[in-house]
Amino acid sequence: MSLNPRDVVIVDFGRTPMGRSKGGMHRNTRAEDMSAHLISKLLERNGKVDPKEVEDVIWGCVNQTLEQGWNIARMASLMTPIPHTSAAQTVSRLCGSSMSALHTAAQAIMTGNGDVFVVGGVEHMGHVSMMHGVDPNPHLSLHAAKASGMMGLTAEMLGKMHGITREQQDLFGLRSHQLAHKATVEGKFKDEIIPMQGYDENGFLKVFDFDETIRPETTLEGLASLKPAFNPKGGTVTAGTSSQITDGASCMIVMSGQRAMDLGIQPLAVIRSMAVAGVDPAIMGYGPVPSTQKALKRAGLTMADIDFIELNEAFAAQALPVLKDLKVLDKMDEKVNLHGGAIALGHPFGCSGARISGTLLNVMKQNGGTLGVATMCVGLGQGITTVFERV
């Protein structure tokens, strides 16, 4: 396809290996250093992109305190080849933060407010725990269900409403690990993982070019033996069917169609449409349904037009109802999360939006797809979606 001057194109994508938050490979690496390394290496492998042209570094991060505080986007940017004259901002839409970073850059490009952006995100959940420094307002319970901030219970609710069984969830969790392991063995992650130094379980410094979160030894019997993680009496959501708590970062170079043509760059994809939507916080995991429907309508497409889908696997109990109501549950094995998802790879909050978007682009490239959807639920009841077209 030919590009229009204000089209938003993805030039390249990279991510760190996903590390376990408890004693994992990134345990001695700070979030800013992880981010700076990733940005620097991605720019290094895209020599046609002059760092001086970067308008803004837009970085997703949820818990913006400790090493992730004081505008981590700027902290990381200052340690890269990007000059001090370029700007940087940190954004949060909880789980959808780095996809929001992508949308912010896209909107700037579409309106002529910049041509070259670096976007992505990071979350070091081992150094800055999920609830560190968080003080929820008790008055919220007057406006939303008391458990709306407890993601596992919202997944339990959504699964119950849609009749999702424990066995269905266990099968979905097993699938995630099997597909992620298969992708690793077959080298499918090679283009997206940017190697990093880290520490192995014995404390030795080594270069990691693989995700240490994947458990190829996972069995259906093992998953079935796990106790409910959030509702001990009658719950069906377990640690094995929930996204892992992990550390990681992801990064994209985004630019206008005009600048890509001027530089002679063949982009990975162009953004066809974007959308966000809200749902009741008590069923926060349902957000991808309205946001995807909205994005498809804006692009003049239907779900039948979409070749591949990346849906963030916050919980199996959440992902399955979304796929059911998007009418792709029966096409899951052909179209959805073909390299596994967050159950196997983890969900470092600020990282995940750009991570699933980049993984989608690699799946499309490797399998010859043209149109793809990246979508995710967002804590407290939101959904965010991006529709991509490969060029």
Curated annotation (Swiss-Prot):
The active site is at C95, H347, C377. PROSITE patterns: THIOLASE_1, THIOLASE_2. The gene is fadA. It comes from Pseudomonas putida (strain ATCC 47054 / DSM 6125 / CFBP 8728 / NCIMB 11950 / KT2440). GO terms for biological process: fatty acid beta-oxidation; phenylacetate catabolic process. The lineage of its organism: Bacteria, Pseudomonadati, Pseudomonadota, Gammaproteobacteria, Pseudomonadales. The keyword Acyltransferase applies. InterPro entries: FadA, Thiolase, Thiolase-like, Thiolase-like_sf_Thiolase, Thiolase_acyl_enz_int_AS, Thiolase_C, Thiolase_CS, Thiolase_N. Its main location: cytoplasm. This is 3-ketoacyl-CoA thiolase. GO terms for cellular component: cytoplasm. It is an enzyme of class 2 (transferase). Keywords: Acyltransferase, Cytoplasm, Fatty acid metabolism, Lipid degradation, Lipid metabolism, Transferase. Its EC number is 2.3.1.16. Heterotetramer of two alpha chains (FadB) and two beta chains (FadA). Belongs to the thiolase-like superfamily. Thiolase family. Catalyzes the final step of fatty acid oxidation in which acetyl-CoA is released and the CoA ester of a fatty acid two carbons shorter is formed. It is found in: Cytoplasm. Pathway: Lipid metabolism; fatty acid beta-oxidation. Pfam families: Thiolase_C, Thiolase_N. GO terms for molecular function: acetyl-CoA C-acyltransferase activity. It comes from the Bacteria. It catalyses: an acyl-CoA + acetyl-CoA = a 3-oxoacyl-CoA + CoA.
